Design a protein with these regions (language model features):
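Asp-box/BNR beta-propeller blade signature and adjacent active/binding-site loops
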Residues: 1-139
């Protein structure tokens, strides 16, 4: 992955779509929009992209249609997203995600959800992601 390459993933509310664009010059110019809804099998609201290492990205957000908190793993720097993981669901409110790397090297993903409470009274929830880079696991 080139140092100036940027991947941007957005939801288009009007078109009921999720798309990505690429920049190869640090954000000065951008590629044409590419629809990734078929790859994700959902409209991903509030997509949150986290680079875990040079080639691996975690994409998380809300699957609008299924009312789920989901994440996907890309092992090719955002070209393909698969390995869908359903973290939680919600009744009427929830699912916006955020991810941070901990000092242990693990990643903490947090979201809110009313799956186990009254509707519209969400709890804050979290999970740890244990990710081992390929360079760490091969030696």
């Amino acid at each position: 992955v080139a140092p100036d390459q940027i991947l941007c993933i957005q939801r288009d509310r009007a078109r009921h779509d999720t798309f990505r664009t690429w920049s190869a010059d640090g954000g000065r110019t951008w590629s044409e929009r590419e629809n990734i809804r078929p790859m994700l099998d959902c409209i991903l609201q509030r997509p949150f992209l986290t680079r875990l290492d040079e080639d691996v990205c975690l994409l998380s957000g809300r699957d609008f249609g299924r009312k789920q908190v989901v994440c996907y793993l890309s092992k090719d720097a955002g070209q393909n997203f698969g390995n869908r993981l359903e973290l939680d669901s919600h009744q009427r409110d929830g699912s916006y995600t955020s991810v941070v790397e901990l000092t242990t090297g693990e990643f903490l993903i947090v979201w809110y959800s009313d799956s186990h409470t009254e509707p519209l009274r969400p709890d804050i929830k979290s999970a740890k992601l244990h990710y081992k880079a390929a360079s760490e696991s091969s030696g």
